[in-house]
Amino acid sequence: MEEQHYQLLDGKAVSAQMKKEMAEEVAQIKAAGGKIPHLAAILVGHDGGSETYVASKVKTCQEIGFKSTLIRFEEDVTEEELLRKVDELNNDPDVDGFIVQLPLPKHISEQKVIEAIDYRKDVDGFHPINVGRMSIGLPCFVSATPAGILELLKRYHIETQGKHCVVLGRSNIVGKPMATLMMQKSYPGDCTVTVCHSRSKNLKEMCLSADIIIVALGVPEFLKGDMVKEGAVIVDVGTTRMPSSITKSGFKLTGDVLFNEVAPKCSYITPVPGGVGPMTIISLMRNTLLAGKKAIYK
């Protein structure tokens, strides 16, 4: 048995620590007679993944001491009705931040809904104003998954300056913001960034030259052992629900990295589950706290 020389980037442990820090801060706000941060979430329909995420967000709010409101609509809600609710939350002074859980049903334009959210309450960081401010390095709400990954790298003191970072995936939610953040002029950042996607040629060569690989493709076990150099840092954003006869729920979460092959070559790697997932939720909570304190937008 060769000795394990990689270290886990333990999102579960880090998020628990951050939860504790935030709960203490909320207790202080409360003791001083300040306003308790309030997060609202809109959930449309009954998508299994969305139900799980939203339940987890509400539970974390309670654990930290935030106020939370869950607003449910049926699958057949009209776009107009949804936009009216968004407008109502925009104008509710008690709500500091809110999210609309994606994906939305086909008959509703996600972009239209995102753009209707007041960017000062857009704690998901999806509004074009927040995305734009992020890309030019201004204070903003950074979307939760990229923000969570940065915090994870920071708390493990991962060296990033001058390193080659390969981002696999170019989605607006993870790939693009991740690439932007990894090349910003601050820590963690200052990387040389390559973005690869389904149309990329020499993908294996790119990965083999990477010091840091952030995998956000949604393709289970895509990154294999022969694509990774010794000592690389691997961040696995993938969470695909795969059928499983072993688990109680009948499915297991599978990452985009073939863990057993890749881990032995790494210096650091995130597990799935327990890596990026918990960091995403805790980063949404941090954005809510910042919104409550008016720390980014007055």
UniProtKB/Swiss-Prot annotation:
Subunit composition and interactions: Homodimer.
A GO cellular component annotation in the UniProt record: cytosol
InterPro entries documented for this protein: Aminoacid_DH-like_N_sf, NAD(P)-bd_dom_sf, THF_DH/CycHdrlase, THF_DH/CycHdrlase_cat_dom, THF_DH/CycHdrlase_CS, THF_DH/CycHdrlase_NAD-bd_dom
Catalytic activity: (6R)-5,10-methylene-5,6,7,8-tetrahydrofolate + NADP(+) = (6R)-5,10-methenyltetrahydrofolate + NADPH; (6R)-5,10-methenyltetrahydrofolate + H2O = (6R)-10-formyltetrahydrofolate + H(+)
Top-rank taxon, per record: Bacteria
SUPFAM superfamilies referenced in this protein's UniProt entry, alphabetically: Aminoacid dehydrogenase-like, N-terminal domain, NAD(P)-binding Rossmann-fold domains
Species per Swiss-Prot/TrEMBL record: Parabacteroides distasonis (strain ATCC 8503 / DSM 20701 / CIP 104284 / JCM 5825 / NCTC 11152)
Pfam families: THF_DHG_CYH, THF_DHG_CYH_C
Name this protein carries in UniProt: Bifunctional protein FolD
